Amino acid sequence: MFTIYTYILVFVTKYRGKVFTKEVLDDVEKSFIEVCSKFESQLIEFNGESDHVHLLVSYPPKVSISALVNSLKGVSSRMIRKKKYQSIESKLWDDALWSPSYFASSCGGAPIDILRQYIEQQNTPS
């Protein structure tokens, strides 16, 4: 039997700085999709607000959640620094975008549609 883990992840910006715009979140989502594919994982749903993001990810047991999270946060942070967004550059703290912590919750038997609905209902900044 093939097992896939499904988790909700939440990452917050360092000091809860309100740095995300719709444009930035779109680029963050693209970087998350790329990272997930390298880990043989899938970004099922993504949404964010000005100071945090919600992800619904599935991944195989051979991948550790901490390795996936570290890569998601590291790659997206480097991408944002490289693009030098005016709205963010002055708000980065020692070049850190993300808080070092994260929230992760396994989804057990919860229906994916309900989890997607929860993430979709987050308020995306304009």
Give residue spans per PLM region:
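Basic nucleic-acid-binding interfaces
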Residues: M1-S126
